[in-house]
């Protein structure tokens, strides 16, 4: 399954409009923010059509899973589905299991998961974490996090922002690149996104820029923000581009009309059955685009 899909779901009182473009989308937020209402509208329309009193317009096949039924669990309900956007209601504990993560990876479906807790088994993007925002009768599904998020606001004067330390999750070509870019700062690799907090804590002084791949960072976002907020004696900025490979592909270093077309329409080229996250897609695309040229690149070095 690939591509971007849109939904318009409404009742007499509320209207939801949103699009889904990756294999994993997370909807979070407090109670009474519209999450259950959205899934209820989608479910009842799927079950009864216009007789439900609701209206749903979409260019996708979809399914809504609310809870286990007697004699039928989530595997019975979901395993046969193909090329479908599957919405899963909150409080279904199976979404935190390795078995479900394997199903997401292999099924070829898109998943919209309602949960307040991070899904640590799944590699989802910071750009696919949403909250439902209500403005009168119109309800929008808005992105919770953005590509660059400033952790602290206690350094309002830009010339005071002297970054002494750069920490990146990459230990290979990305690390080499950032070391050249930030040659006047201390450059450190955490050897993976799971070690970033530890590395930041070990660097006890100095303002810091932390660079990680946003395409698969979604489950870590909340815990990292909380960990960095308590470091109140210094400024910590967290930058999460899709991936290092993505930055190269978008830089116009590689002159290719085909590449430009792909980068302008990424959802149309990422087959979720083949690529667990966009990060995997960008890595393969960069290797493919540079395989025969002078800009030959590997995962371990430039």
What are these regions (language model features)?
Residues 1-16, 140-144:
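N-terminal pre-Walker A segment at the start of P-loop NTPase domains
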Residues 27:
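Hydrophobic anchor at the beta1->P-loop junction of P-loop NTPases
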Residues 33-35:
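Conserved glycine(s) of the Walker
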Residues 38-40:
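Post-Walker A alpha-helix
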Residues 44-55:
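Post-Walker A helix-loop "phosphate-sensing" segment adjacent to the P-loop in P-loop NTPases
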Residues 65-98:
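Conserved P-loop NTPase "ATPase switch" module shared by AAA+ and STAND
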Residues 87-89, 108-118:
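Structural recognition of the conserved hydrophobic beta-strand(s) that form the central parallel beta-sheet
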Residues 92-93, 127-302:
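Acidic, divalent-metal-binding catalytic cores of TOPRIM
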